[in-house]
Amino acid sequence: LDVKNYLFDIEAGIKVNEYIESAITLDATTIKTKFDKIAPILQTIHASGKELRGEFAPFEEIKKYESLIEEKIPYANYKAVREEVFSLEKRLANLGVDRKSCHIDLVPENFIESPQGRLYLIDWEYSSMNDPMWDLAALFLESEFTPQEEEAFLSHYESEQTPVSREKIAIYKILQDAIWSLWTVYKEEQGADFGDYGVNRYQRAVKGLAYYGGSDEK
């Protein structure tokens, strides 16, 4: 799945991996031509049965960033939106969280392709136990899939070993936008400048809540 690792020293903070000569990094456009390669990678991860260290808990992540942010959170109607976001916790519990090994951070740039056509998935910093639908939500959000592209990918991914819940994907999209919008506020307090990235993700979370609230899947 990943490139070969030669050195991994936790104490020194050093990691040395194989260098893939002339590798191509995917982007939000090229990733949509690789469904037949990406789906098996995710199926392998999600059906592996491996127990990864740590568990990615979305609602705890929200609380974590809220506690780290020193100033007032600058997003419109944040308190009301937060209540709606946290109301999803019970719904997720009712649906059931399928605890599997996950990559967590499926931005297109974490997929690289060798000149021979082999696809690698890199940057496992956030990998932990979570519901596989989190990974699918991340894949769709980070590369801005259309509904038609989502269904096309799911036709490659869905199987008896890797079932799909479209409702959970919708919920995890909202949670991801909420988390990364808060992450942006925290980082900008530390001096970073992400432009309108944070507010755009927050606004998309709000739209997602409105759409989910009107969905007949609930």
Please provide the spans of the model-predicted regions.
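ATP-binding pocket architecture of kinase catalytic cores
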Residues: 1-57, 68, 72-79
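An alpha-helical support segment within catalytic cores of ATP-dependent transferases
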Residues: 50-104, 115-116
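ATP/Mg2+ or Mg2+-diphosphate-binding catalytic cores
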Residues: 76, 80, 182-218
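Pre-DFG segment of protein kinase catalytic domains
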Residues: 101, 120-123
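Active-site activation/catalytic loop segments of kinase-like enzymes and analogous catalytic loops
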Residues: 133-161, 174-192, 204
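Start-of-helix signal in alpha-solenoid helical-repeat scaffolds, especially tetratricopeptide repeats
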Residues: 167, 171-175
